[in-house]
């Protein structure tokens, strides 16, 4: 994109939105329902079974129209088309951003098309061999356990999706486990009941140079060598997803067991690529196809639907509204499904690594806020932990409820759905002092006692929330959901004017870690140098006196 860039706060729609925000800050969300009986119908949107409800946001139709106008002034439709056309929107690294091509929603670059098709075929053949029991290790035993060694995008997406799609209590063959932390305890736990002769490790590192992943791979190799004994080749117990075939070969993984991935696939968008190999192994090739199909359906909707009917666009605009016009600094993800227990961790990387930036496309610094702080946890567990802050804390928090509906006869899921709806309603409506007093009087408390206790029962409410309803937590719906959030993040990054596809802050942290690993205390601040010295002293002589 070569057109001049205008920061969003300088667009005319921005001042219009500031006026809407001043008006809506004085109104409660519950009042908006009183003024508009058709509010749910107006502010809920569907596509291929997925429902996006924005009616509990602190927004109304005129404000939403102004947000859509902002998207137009920011040339978002041009940005969407540039994304799908393969323009180098990751301009700092001079790369296209084409993870949608992995799902069949757009064409891969011609020079990569053949390699991509071959890799996908190899993934399928590898998966079939593992799941059928025909792939064996060095001793001839079939592989029964696959352990993925990766971190960041090489772990979060496949791990989250496997948790969501492998039914609880079903012991898949082979079983797939994930190890990311350099803390040896995670690897030890993954291997506690494992048989080296029937265990396969997938080393997932695009560069085959990720420090944490290589450390775990080396520990895994030592474990295999100790367990298999002399004369057994541990290479039969490794495969890699990487572009560094020479580095993988130096480690002991032959080229025929290395699955490459295109350079235009960023880590946090890589579950759709060969990085998704452990997911395909866990759920099977046909379910992986359904996963891709769900994402492709959302891709096609994002590319073709008008902004005012486009789910990722509307979701992104609602989030931008909360961040920049209502001053809400955090987004809590509340999936009401145990299978989505790692969804918040996946979204943390997607949102905060993509949009946690301040440098704009023209090199200037942003004067408005970008990514919110993303956190959360699974319902109903969170209701007994951090939901208290939503009800009676001093901050407004934006909330995303993700609710798979499932079958009508699933009693536990029906209860989860009811709890999710109750939470979103209660957090919107709250409880005022008069209601609190009335409830205490009804319980028989004396007026003096009720007057003392009632203020402690007041819940301000007015917490804005989005609800995403899924027909079920299946492969197609999960693909839709993940692509919805991916494109939402693009929408926000585009309007803010940042590059959502690099992560130079992460690289600075890696550089510092390498410096400390080299053992040099020079050129470090006094605190860091002091901590290094204290840690070394503790290693030598722990003082517990």
UniProtKB/Swiss-Prot annotation:
Pathway(s) it belongs to: Carbohydrate biosynthesis; gluconeogenesis; Carbohydrate degradation; glycolysis; D-glyceraldehyde 3-phosphate and glycerone phosphate from D-glucose: step 2/4
GO cellular component, one term: cytosol
This protein's UniProt keywords: Cytoplasm, Gluconeogenesis, Glycolysis, Isomerase
Active site: 353, 384, 510
Gene3D superfamilies for the chain: 1.10.1390.10, Glucose-6-phosphate isomerase like protein, domain 1
Record field: catalytic activity: alpha-D-glucose 6-phosphate = beta-D-fructose 6-phosphate
Protein's cellular compartments: Cytoplasm
EC number assigned by the record: 5.3.1.9
InterPro entries: G6P_Isomerase, G6P_Isomerase_C, Phosphoglucose_isomerase_CS, SIS_dom_sf, SIS_PGI_1, SIS_PGI_2
Main location: cytoplasm
GO biological process annotation, one example: gluconeogenesis
Single GO term (MF): carbohydrate derivative binding
Protein role: Catalyzes the reversible isomerization of glucose-6-phosphate to fructose-6-phosphate.
Family membership noted in the UniProt record: Belongs to the GPI family.
HAMAP family referenced in this protein's UniProt entry, alphabetically: G6P_isomerase (MF_00473)
NCBIfam families, per the entry: PRK00179.1 (NF001211)
Record-given protein name: Glucose-6-phosphate isomerase
